[in-house]
Amino acid sequence: MAVQTPRQRLANAKFNKNNEKYRKYGKKKEGKTEKTAPVISKTWLGILLFLLVGGGVLQLISYIL
């Protein structure tokens, strides 16, 4: 590594101080939380619910008549 002048040393120290202050190496951002996607989409959930409830209603109607 090359020898640094005192002016370079001061500039590097200032730069490093600002980087450590604002970048926070390796730390996660606390403001954001990751959203997990649902296992099944709302559309498929609606279709499945329609089939189950509709089938039950048809069974009740056929039982009554």
Swiss-Prot record:
Q: Which UniProt keywords apply?
A: Endoplasmic reticulum, Membrane, Transmembrane, Transmembrane helix, Unfolded protein response
One GO CC annotation, please?
A: endoplasmic reticulum membrane
Superkingdom of origin organism = Eukaryota
Signal sequence range: none
Question: Topology in the membrane?
Answer: Single-pass membrane protein
Q: Does the keyword Transmembrane apply?
A: yes
Q: Which residues cross the membrane?
A: 45-65
Biological process per Gene Ontology, one example term: endoplasmic reticulum unfolded protein response
A Pfam entry, by short name: RAMP4
Functional description taken from the UniProt entry: Interacts with target proteins during their translocation into the lumen of the endoplasmic reticulum. Protects unfolded target proteins against degradation during ER stress. May facilitate glycosylation of target proteins after termination of ER stress.
- Identify its protein family: Belongs to the RAMP4 family.
Instruction: State any further remark.
Output: Present with 846 molecules/cell in log phase SD medium.
Name of this protein: Protein YSY6
